Amino acid sequence: MDTIAFRMVLNRGMRDEYERRHREIWPELVSKLHNAGVRDYRIFLDDDTHHLFAVLTRTADHSMERLPELAVMRKWWDYMADIMQTAPDRTPLQQALIPLFELQHPSN
């Protein structure tokens, strides 16, 4: 398992809509994320800057690089494109974050 983190940007005034859409995330998308090796995925918001900070844990043999090929993933990105910053192909703009510190319980 490894953990990655990245930053995205939410458009102003879209917090409630972003939360609503994620509360109603499509079961097919959840299944595809799990099948790709995603084991834990959390997104946090800095309300002052509208930056979203995502932390994702995935299996060592993950296949996340194939997610953009999936119709349901593309459909989700199209669905989210009106409320966040995206590239011309409607994928969310993401900036990888560099890990600087980790604290784990000795039993891990």
From Swiss-Prot:
Major location (coarse): cytoplasm
Catalytic activity: alpha-L-rhamnose = beta-L-rhamnose
GO cellular component, one term: cytoplasm
Location of this chain's protein in the cell: Cytoplasm
The entry's keywords: Carbohydrate metabolism, Cytoplasm, Isomerase, Rhamnose metabolism
EC number annotated for this UniProt entry: 5.1.3.32
Gene3D superfamilies referenced in this protein's UniProt entry, alphabetically: 3.30.70.100
Pathway where this protein functions: Carbohydrate metabolism; L-rhamnose metabolism
Transmembrane region(s): none
Class in the EC hierarchy, top level: isomerase
Binding-site list for substrate: 18, 41, 76-77
InterPro entries, A to Z: Dimeric_a/b-barrel, L-rhamnose_mutarotase, Rham/fucose_mutarotase
Active site feature: 22 (proton donor)
A GO term, aspect molecular function: L-rhamnose mutarotase activity
UniProt keyword annotation of Coiled coil present: no
Function in brief: Involved in the anomeric conversion of L-rhamnose.
Subunit structure: Homodimer.
PANTHER family according to UniProt: L-RHAMNOSE MUTAROTASE (PTHR34389:SF2)
Similarity field: Belongs to the rhamnose mutarotase family.
Name assigned to this protein: L-rhamnose mutarotase
Organism name: Paraburkholderia phymatum (strain DSM 17167 / CIP 108236 / LMG 21445 / STM815) (Burkholderia phymatum)
